[in-house]
């Protein structure tokens, strides 16, 4: 083994042999030039990323008081964060529905497009509330999003019934948020909810109620062609308009 090392060392140039092994790590580049000694103060500390994150100054901008906050009650701020979570949950449920109906053994593609559109709308609702939170000087506190209660949505009628119940729950939460804003004397939040949410929720509930009624009249889910015809004609025309 020693003889092999001596043999190889004869073929290594003096410049390469003088190199020292280098360890890889996340560190800032050193300001160094040949013939100039290294300054220990220039060497970046090698710390794990988690330790670096935990050592941030807690008095930074995120933890400081807002300069724009006015007439914005902490209860309203917390309720908006809960509403954001509910809107994202609704988007999650609709996303599950959308990709269930695009499965090869279901193949109701207009149901899929309809629920995908609903999912994107719910995400937009959540983002709009996030923008409001920042505008009012609140702090966004995201929470875990609960998974949908089922993965197999059985039929178009069952999915529409679940969507109707979901929209009613979202609407009830918005009504409670509006009542809270009114109780705390926050006309801006009341106007925001009335302008962008409450009227749209009523329209969505009416639309889903109509879809459930028409599917039942057509004999879904027992009649084999009912959901196919509803998918092709009713939802197909709606998706073209959207």
Curated annotation (Swiss-Prot):
Q: What is the gene called?
A: FTMT
Q: Which residues bind Fe cation 1?
A: 87, 122, 125
Organelle transit peptide residues: 1-49
Ferritin-like diiron domain span: 70-219
Q: What is its EC number?
A: 1.16.3.1
Q: Could you give one GO CC term from the UniProt record?
A: nucleus
Q: Where in the cell is it found?
A: Mitochondrion
Q: Which UniProt keywords apply?
A: Iron, Iron storage, Metal-binding, Mitochondrion, Oxidoreductase, Transit peptide
Q: Where is this region: Disordered?
A: 47-71
Kind of enzyme, top EC level?
A: oxidoreductase
Coiled-coil residues: none
According to UniProt, the reaction catalysed is: 4 Fe(2+) + O2 + 4 H(+) = 4 Fe(3+) + 2 H2O
Q: Kindly list the residue ranges recorded as spanning the membrane.
A: none
Family the entry assigns: Belongs to the ferritin family.
How this chain assembles, per its entry, is: Homooligomer of 24 subunits. The functional molecule is roughly spherical and contains a central cavity into which the polymeric mineral iron core is deposited.
**Which one Pfam family would you cite for this protein?**
Ferritin
Which CDD domains does UniProt cross-reference here?
Answer: Euk_Ferritin
Give the PANTHER family listed for this entry: FERRITIN (PTHR11431), FERRITIN, MITOCHONDRIAL (PTHR11431:SF30)
The Swiss-Prot or TrEMBL record annotates one GO molecular function as:
ferric iron binding
| Its biological purpose | Catalyzes the oxidation of ferrous iron(II) to ferric iron(III) and stores iron in a soluble, non-toxic, readily available form. Important for iron homeostasis. Iron is taken up in the ferrous form and deposited as ferric hydroxides after oxidation.
In this chain, Fe cation 2 is annotated as bound at 122, 167, 201
Q: What is this protein called?
A: Ferritin, mitochondrial
For biological process, the GO terms are: intracellular iron ion homeostasis; iron ion transport; protein maturation
Record's compositionally biased regions (Low complexity): 47-58
Sorted alphabetically, which Gene3D superfamilies does this protein's record hold?
A: 1.20.1260.10
Q: List the expressing tissues.
A: Detected in testis and erythroleukemia. Expression is very low or not detectable in brain, colon, heart, kidney, liver, lung, muscle, placental, spleen and small intestine.
């Amino acid at each position: 083994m020693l003889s092999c090392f001596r043999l190889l060392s004869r073929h290594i140039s003096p410049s390469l042999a003088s190199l020292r092994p280098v360890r890889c790590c996340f560190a800032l580049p050193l300001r160094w030039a040949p013939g100039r000694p290294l300054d220990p103060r220039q060497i970046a500390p090698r710390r794990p990323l988690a330790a670096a994150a935990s050592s941030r100054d807690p008095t930074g901008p995120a933890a400081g008081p807002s300069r724009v906050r006015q007439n914005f009650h902490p209860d309203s701020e917390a309720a908006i964060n809960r509403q954001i979570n509910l809107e994202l949950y609704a988007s999650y449920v609709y996303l599950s529905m959308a990709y269930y109906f695009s499965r090869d053994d279901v193949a109701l593609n207009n149901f899929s497009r309809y629920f995908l559109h609903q999912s994107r709308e719910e995400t937009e609702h959540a983002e709009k509330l996030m923008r409001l939170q920042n505008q009012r000087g609140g702090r966004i506190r995201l929470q875990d999003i609960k998974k949908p209660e089922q993965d197999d949505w059985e039929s178009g009628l069952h999915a529409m019934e679940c969507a109707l119940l979901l929209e009613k729950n979202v609407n009830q939460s918005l009504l409670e948020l509006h009542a809270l804003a009114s109780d705390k004397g926050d006309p801006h939040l009341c106007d925001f909810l009335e302008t962008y949410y409450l009227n749209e929720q009523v329209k969505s509930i009416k639309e889903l109620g109509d879809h459930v009624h028409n599917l039942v009249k057509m004999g879904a889910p027992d009649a084999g062609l009912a959901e196919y015809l509803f998918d092709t004609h009713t939802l197909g025309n709606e998706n073209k308009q959207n």
